[in-house]
Amino acid sequence: MTKRKIVVALGGNAILSTDASANAQIKAVKETVKQLVAFVKQGDQLIISHGNGPQVGNLLIQQAASDSEKTPAMPLDTVGAMSQGEIGYWMQNAFNEVLAEEGLALDVATIVTQTIVDAKDEAFQNPTKPIGPFYSEAEAKKQQSINPEAHFVEDAGRGWRRVVPSPRPIGIQEAPVIQKLVEGNVITISAGGGGVPVAKEGNKLRGVEAVIDKDFASEKLAELVGADMLIILTAVDNVYVNFNKPDQKKLTNVSVAELEDYIKDDQFAKGSMLPKIQTAIEYVNNRPDSKAIITSLDNVKNLLAHDAGTIITK
């Protein structure tokens, strides 16, 4: 069987359970890894990316609460790097355990990834990316008083949430390193939380206060390492049009042109499914012989047994 190079972008539900303790998240990560090892067993080369919204949000709360002259709060880019280490550590250990249980001898590595953005991206003037937990209006005002530069908005009636800029990625600094690891058959965890956003200043990289959409970062990484497939794992088995309406339709095999027509019809929610669709379109346009798949973690077994989920091709 020909080895496929696959980038798998994990949704937040693959890491965080209702219990935000380290032990609970470690357990959730291991259950996720058990599903992903099925790809390895059939010879695929895996590059794993993941979200970090809840984790980085909680770290920011801790930073703000203990901010003092002796223990100054770290900026958002540094906190993003902290979350990559945290989640990467959990995931590496989970892979090592599950691989041992399956009798597979493979190495696993986490790469703290820097995602290059344009410092002039319009996103910096319009923070939209929600991070961290939901607050009541009073709690949000309290958080804002602690960190006056933070922006909070009401999120679809579920409460108030901090929002930060989310510029589009234009490069991945560590892509050549990740490529070498994958070619050496190392399972690689990278672009966690979309990577640490950095902007070029001459021959330097400067961290910026932002969060990169992990799906867009995963697409850029898949493009740069020449992945054969991009799998975006989310909470549903398939993408739907006319969602929650009597004529709801499940999409199985769909072309880029069809998806672009659906976007014109406003078929996909801007805050959730639309970025995933845009990611899939961008990837397939950049690599026309490849395919993108949007499905759920629980549907991975069906995907491996036969084509499942929503499969996007040129």
From Swiss-Prot:
One of its GO terms (cellular component) is cytosol. Pathway: Metabolic intermediate metabolism; carbamoyl phosphate degradation; CO(2) and NH(3) from carbamoyl phosphate: step 1/1. Its main location: cytoplasm. GO terms for molecular function: ATP binding; carbamate kinase activity. Its EC number is 2.7.2.2. It catalyses: hydrogencarbonate + NH4(+) + ATP = carbamoyl phosphate + ADP + H2O + H(+). Keywords: Arginine metabolism, ATP-binding, Cytoplasm, Kinase, Nucleotide-binding, Transferase. One of its GO terms (biological process) is arginine deiminase pathway. It is found in: Cytoplasm. Belongs to the carbamate kinase family. PANTHER family: CARBAMATE KINASE (PTHR30409), CARBAMATE KINASE-RELATED (PTHR30409:SF1). NCBIfam families: arcC (TIGR00746), PRK12352.1 (NF009007). This is Carbamate kinase. The gene is arcC.
